[in-house]
Structure formats: C-alpha cells, structure tokens
Swiss-Prot record:
One of its GO terms (cellular component) is small ribosomal subunit. The keyword NADP does not apply. Keywords: Chloroplast, Plastid, Ribonucleoprotein, Ribosomal protein, RNA-binding, rRNA-binding. The gene is rps4. Part of the 30S ribosomal subunit. Contacts protein S5. The interaction surface between S4 and S5 is involved in control of translational fidelity. The keyword Ribosomal protein applies. This is Small ribosomal subunit protein uS4c. Belongs to the universal ribosomal protein uS4 family. One of the primary rRNA binding proteins, it binds directly to 16S rRNA where it nucleates assembly of the body of the 30S subunit.
Length: 207
C-alpha cells in the first residue's frame, strides 16, 4: 500500500487530529453525530478499534502499510515493551525530529526538505526521511538563504516549551539554528495521543 497523498482534512475528520499530518484542527465526524443519530450508530468492533489506532499511527507519521509492518517486526524483536519501542522508532525518524524541533509545520514538509538534500546530520547530508537519529546527533539546515529567513521567522514564533525534553533547539545563530538529540525519547514525550497496544494487537497475526 502506497503512502496517502489525498485530502488531509478528510483523514483527520475520520481519525481525529493528527499533529504530524496537518496543524489544522477540525471537529471529527464522531463529535458531530446528533442525539437522534447516536441511537442508530453501529457499535464498533474490537477489530475496528484496533484498525483505527493503526491508521492513526500510520497517517500521523506518513508511513506506508509495509513500512509500519516492518517497524512492528523490529519492535517485536527488541527487548522491552513492543508498543513503546514502536513509538520510539517512529519518533526518532529524521522527518519527525525536524517536525518536533519546529523546523517545519508538518512531517510531510520535513520529508520534502530531506528529499531535496537540505538537511545535515553531523555535517553530512542525509536524504532519507526514515534515517534513525541517535543521541548526540546534531541537525542543521543547508537550505537556500530564502528558506533560512523563513525558518528563522518561524522559529521566533515557535514556543520552545513545545519541544520535548529529549531534543534541544539552539538559536545562538538565528540564521543557523541547530537541533540536538539529547537521548532516546521516553513514552511521556510522544507527540501523538494513542494507545499503542491496540496497534500491536492489530498486527499480532501479521508481524
């Protein structure tokens, strides 16, 4: 299954707000159901609940079905909680790190910068959005000056308290912002509200 490229609002109306996909907030279809319609709503099956959790995870991080399945398999083979390791793997992707640092408004925007070879990790160009960032990595922007000025203005208005503790944003040089990875993210700092166990259960027979 390929990566979704359709209307984003349609997705978040169905799956609720996904910060990585879009910064627009909309009321979900579930909240718009009138009192008379609630009585005739079909009960969602356990499979449906797990499927929705999986879809929320996939669309928020911009993954294909195959990519997400591969991450689940990696998480299953590691020591510790499969669900938490899965979230950690997704959060430590380079495209998500750029998003959490405030360099870009969404993960798709981050992926575009990376694909255009504008991102450096430890002074080396990285053009793979799925690149796994590690503690002590330093992330900088090598984009044209026009984007540098846009970025500096964006970061001026970006609230630093939105940056999770495992990351640090340095603006000592306003036109050359730097992002630092302090340590692997913990569960409390995950950017998406989700029950990861539902995703693990969904893939229990596939991974």
């Amino acid at each position: 299954m390929s990566r979704y490229r359709g209307p984003r609002l349609r997705i978040i109306r169905r799956l609720q707000n996904l910060p990585g996909l879009t910064n627009k907030l909309v009321e979900s279809k579930k909240n718009k159901v009138s009192g008379s319609d609630q009585s005739i709503q079909k009960k969602v099956s356990q499979y449906g609940i797990r499927l929705e959790a999986k879809q929320r995870l996939r669309f928020n991080y911009g993954l294909t079905e195959r990519q997400l399945l591969n991450y689940v398999r990696i998480a299953r083979g590691a020591k510790g909680s499969t669900g938490q390791i899965l979230l950690q793997l997704l959060e430590m992707r380079l495209d998500n790190i750029l998003f959490r640092l405030g360099f870009v408004p969404t993960i798709p925007s981050a992926r575009q910068l990376i694909n255009h070879r504008h991102i450096l990790v430890n002074n080396r160009i990285v053009d793979v959005p799925s690149f796994h960032c590690k503690p002590k990595d330093i992330i900088t922007i090598g984009a044209p000056k026009t984007y540098q000025s846009i970025l500096s203005k964006r970061l001026e208005s970006f609230a630093k308290d939105q940056i999770p503790e495992h990351l640090t944003l340095s603006l000592s040089e306003p036109k050359k912002p730097k992002g630092f990875v302090n340590y692997l993210i913990n569960r409390e700092s995950i950017g998406l509200k989700i029950n990861e166990l539902l995703v693990v259960e969904y893939y229990s027979r596939k991974a």
